[in-house]
Structure formats: C-alpha cells, structure tokens
C-alpha cells in the first residue's frame, strides 16, 4: 500500500513539473512570436521610409501598440 501511494505521489509531482515546463515554453513562444512581429514591422517601416516617408504611419501606430509605448518617434531609433 505504501508503494502505491508513493507511485501516485511521484506521478502527481511529475504532472505538476510538466505543466510548469509547458507553461514556460508557451510564454517564451509568445514572446518570440511578438518579437518577430515587431521586427517585421520595423523592417517594413524602414523600407517605406526609404521609398516615400509618409506611408508608414499605420505601421508606426501598430508598432507602438505592440511595444506598449504611446507615440513612437522613429527619428530617435538608431538601428533603422
């Protein structure tokens, strides 16, 4: 009887560890997807700024929403 209880306890601990690990993996995946979206928007804004300079306003607003910053001034971004 003692061995059965120990086995069930080990199974519960294993399940809890698996849930924690998969939660961390999911959070990191969401961060990665969000960063890729931000990188694509920055690249698109840079390309449009080279072409005309006026067509990237919608992308700038979307980028500022993703970065949770209010108004984003691209003049201060050094790596574009």
From Swiss-Prot:
Report TM segments: 7-27
State the InterPro entries in the record.
Vpu, Vpu_cyt_dom_sf
Query: Oligomeric state and partners?
Result: Homopentamer. Interacts with host CD4 and BRTC; these interactions induce proteasomal degradation of CD4. Interacts with host BST2; this interaction leads to the degradation of host BST2. Interacts with host FBXW11. Interacts with host AP1M1; this interaction plays a role in the mistrafficking and subsequent degradation of host BST2. Interacts with host RANBP2; this interaction allows Vpu to down-regulate host BLM sumoylation.
Ranges of the Cytoplasmic topological domain: 28-80
Question: Topology in the membrane?
Answer: Single-pass type I membrane protein
Return the GO cellular component terms, semicolon-separated: host cell membrane; membrane
Q: Provide the membrane-side ranges marked Extracellular in the record.
A: 1-6
Q: Does the keyword Membrane apply?
A: yes
Name the chain's protein. Protein Vpu
């Amino acid at each position: 009887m003692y061995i059965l209880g120990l086995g069930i306890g080990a199974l519960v601990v294993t399940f809890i560890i698996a849930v924690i690990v998969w939660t961390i993996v999911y959070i990191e995946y969401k961060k990665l997807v969000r960063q890729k979206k931000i990188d694509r928007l920055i690249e698109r804004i840079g390309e449009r700024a080279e072409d005309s300079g006026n067509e990237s306003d919608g992308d700038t607003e979307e980028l500022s929403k993703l970065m949770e910053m209010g108004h984003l001034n691209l003049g201060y971004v050094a790596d574009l």
